[in-house]
Amino acid sequence: MFRPLLRRLVIGLILQSAAASSVQAQTTDDLFNDSVVQTLEITIHSRDWDTLRANFTSNDFYPADVTWNGLRVRNVGVRSRGLGSRSGVKPGLEVNFAHYSSRGEFLGLRALVLDNLTTDPSMIRERVAMAFYRRIGIPAPREVHANLYVNGDYAGLYVIVEPVDTVLLQRYLGENAGWLYEYHWLTPYFATFLGENLDLYRPYFEPRTHQTQSTFDLFDPVRELFRTINSAPTGSFRDALNARLDLESTLRLIAGEGFMAEWDGLLGYAGMNNFYLYRPPSSAPARLFPWDADHTFQAADYPLLAGAAENVLMRRMLEDPVLRARYFQLVLEAVNAASSGNWLVNEITRDYQQIRDSVLADPFKPYTREEFDSAFAELLTFARTRPAFVTSQVQQNR
């Protein structure tokens, strides 16, 4: 009499254990699996959600629960985020798992960014750009589209973005004990030497690690980096700068930006923008990490060297014959990475087809269906014609 009951109980426990193990076995690779549109749920007090949207220019955090694929994290901090993309209708969000508990995390991540996709009618530029950076060997955040639900209601299509933080540094570099700075655009800045006063560098380079250290410890190396960029003698410029900034990865990053017609990056039309600076704890040179690439793929005939003459770093690197030759070689490698196997065309097409239903269902998107489809067509034209244009630019300038 009891044996069938016992057998059912044992089977139930086994199935329950297997299900739990399946949930526990999930990793960030599953979260950033871009073969599907992910689903993310936020449960937050309705009053807090209304306040967050009403005060969308504020950075105040509100407690919430976050659920993904059966995993639920309680009492995380959620706030509005962004610069020009801030919105009270479809707010960009930061989800900080460690805001209310220093030990808080989700799949090893301390935070996530939810990009609201309000500045790009194609809604795929950011994700395609970061995938391209990774394809050409640049450490870049992982990204994946997700349908976001808030308190059970569809809040629209977002992109989940991996933040540039100590977790990302550890994954890419194998260490994270150094100094990480987030660059902030304040005024047009073109890598000039700001002067001896260390406080002049603080507004542009916000420390994201070691924030309690002295002003000297935090900003003297930053000042000396820009002193070297501006003042190192021509004959020793390359060696002097390479001791402070990894020139190979910097040139590779700028080559990627150049191919993608990024007009709001290191060579931005209004000065440098959208990057992080990392100084390792050893004597190794600093590295740059890209961020916020939703202004890429702007025009197929955008000049490859746009902004190069104004930016002191790029201008001086191009004046060095070795660095100039290497830069144009890396640009051609970027062209090949985009063209090989029709990668860029295929990536744009795949992403568009994957998200189209979610875009059309998004009640808060600031674009019409026609604008979305038109933006996709423009991206395809870019992908098909940009390689030949950039190749001709290299031939004219190398």
Give the role of each language-model region.
Residues 25-398:
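Phosphate/dinucleotide-binding and metal-coordinating scaffold of catalytic cores
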Residues 1-10, 16-18:
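Bacterial N-terminal signal peptides that target proteins for export
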